[in-house]
UniProtKB/Swiss-Prot annotation:
The keyword Calcium applies. This is Annexin A2. The modification Phosphoserine is found at residues 26, 184. PROSITE patterns: ANNEXIN_1, ANNEXIN_2. The modification N6-acetyllysine is found at residues 49, 152, 227. Keywords: Acetylation, Annexin, Basement membrane, Calcium, Calcium/phospholipid-binding, Endosome, Extracellular matrix, Isopeptide bond, Phosphoprotein, Repeat, Secreted, Ubl conjugation. The modification N-acetylserine is found at residue 2. Residues 2-24 are annotated as: S100A10-binding site. Heterotetramer containing 2 light chains of S100A10/p11 and 2 heavy chains of ANXA2/p36. Interacts with ATP1B1. Interacts with DYSF. Interacts with COCH. Interacts (via repeat Annexin 1) with PCSK9 (via the C-terminal domain); the interaction inhibits the degradation of LDLR. Interacts with CEACAM1 (via the cytoplasmic domain); this interaction is regulated by phosphorylation of CEACAM1. Interacts with APPL2 and APPL1; targets APPL2 to endosomes and acting in parallel to RAB5A. Interacts with S100A4. May interact with UBAP2. The gene is Anxa2. The modification Phosphotyrosine is found at residues 24, 199. It is found in: Secreted, Extracellular space, Extracellular matrix, Basement membrane; Melanosome; Early endosome. GO terms for molecular function: calcium ion binding; calcium-dependent phospholipid binding; calcium-dependent protein binding; cytoskeletal protein binding; identical protein binding; phosphatidylinositol-4,5-bisphosphate binding; phospholipase A2 inhibitor activity; protease binding.
Length: 339
């Protein structure tokens, strides 16, 4: 017998193919879209002496991802060249990184960022953690499919060979994209039981039962875990984030902190990451670019409002202060406005 929860999950999974672009995205489909015209204008911009970056930026940051795929197709038909390689030759630096990122589908983009985080010597754990902790089941399943297509190997295999210990176990469990979907029924008994088990497995005892933490935090739905973390405070003298800092260290600590923040409030999590990428001397452009590109059609409007609420100034203002030239222009278009 199907439970209401299963039926709802099934609906949300089946409906995924036709979901309209998020109402909270800053980049919307362009109304008078004409792929041929855009392709022609980009071709002209690339051929212009010194390259007409402004036109390239104006077009590609003001089209939805699906529309950009159409432009790339039209461009290739016109010129017999691939749009990404034409733009790679024409552009450079951070602007090139933004524009090439915009040409990939969301899953291709995430897959390539994950691959880059594990390539060569040393792992960029920060990027690995951000992507794996913040993507939904559907997104992760699509990333796994595309990763295999692009790199002829499984994402899980690469994670296993690049990480170790409990950190590896946590990343592998999350990367499967198999957590429960949010149901319509709230199970208060299970909420209480999970909260107590998280406490018993950590702060209450000597040493930490990490597998118990991993199973609860990677298997339960987001909605359920939000309530678990609230309930947790009635058992533990520390909240979940403070408990993590007391119990574990290194990459594992970092991963659990990112995960809990994503579960509690994902737009705020990204607002904090954006702020950290721009505060102090120098800009961590990789993080800045990845979030601006990957969230522009998902929840950028929510991220902007959390950013303003917490930091007192707008995300737009920070980007203006921290970047320059056509790179700045591209990021500001993706931001979608000042608050």
């Amino acid at each position: 017998m199907s439970t209401v929860h299963e039926i709802l999950c099934k609906l949300s999974l089946e409906g995924d193919h036709s979901t309209p672009p998020s109402a909270y995205g800053s980049v919307k489909p362009y109304t008078n879209f004409d792929a041929e015209r855009d392709a022609l204008n980009i071709e002209t911009a690339v051929k212009t002496k010194g390259v007409d970056e402004v036109t390239i930026v104006n077009i590609l940051t003001n089209r939805s991802n699906v529309q950009r795929q159409d432009i790339a197709f039209a461009y290739q038909r016109r010129t017999k060249k691939e749009l990404p390689s034409a733009l790679k030759s024409a552009l450079s630096g951070h602007l090139e990184t933004v524009i090439l990122g915009l040409l990939k589908t969301p899953a291709q983009y995430d897959a390539s960022e994950l691959k880059a985080s594990m390539k060569g010597l040393g792992t960029d754990e920060d990027s690995l953690i951000e992507i794996i902790c913040s993507r939904t089941n559907q997104e992760l399943q699509e990333i796994n499919r595309v990763y295999k297509e692009m790199y002829k190997t499984d994402l899980e295999k690469d994670i296993i060979s690049d990480t170790s210990g409990d950190f590896r176990k946590l990343m592998v469990a999350l990367a499967k994209g198999r957590r429960a979907e949010d149901g319509s029924v709230i199970d208060y008994e299970l909420i209480d039981q999970d909260a107590r088990e998280l406490y018993d497995a950590g702060v209450k005892r000597k040493g930490t039962d990490v597998p118990k933490w991993i199973s609860i935090m990677t298997e339960r739905s987001v909605c359920h875990l939000q309530k678990v973390f609230e309930r947790y405070k009635s058992y533990s003298p520390y909240d979940m984030l403070e408990s993590i800092k007391k119990e574990v260290k290194g990459d594992l600590e970092n991963a659990f902190l990112n995960l809990v923040q994503c579960i509690q409030n994902k737009p705020l999590y990204f607002a904090d990451r954006l702020y950290d990428s721009m505060k102090g001397k120098g800009t961590r452009d990789k993080v800045l670019i990845r979030i601006m590109v990957s969230r522009s059609e998902v929840d950028m409007l929510k991220i902007r409002s959390e950013f303003k609420r917490k930091y007192g100034k707008s995300l737009y203002y920070y980007i203006q202060q921290d970047t320059k030239g056509d790179y700045q222009k591209a990021l500001l278009y993706l931001c979608g406005g000042d608050d």
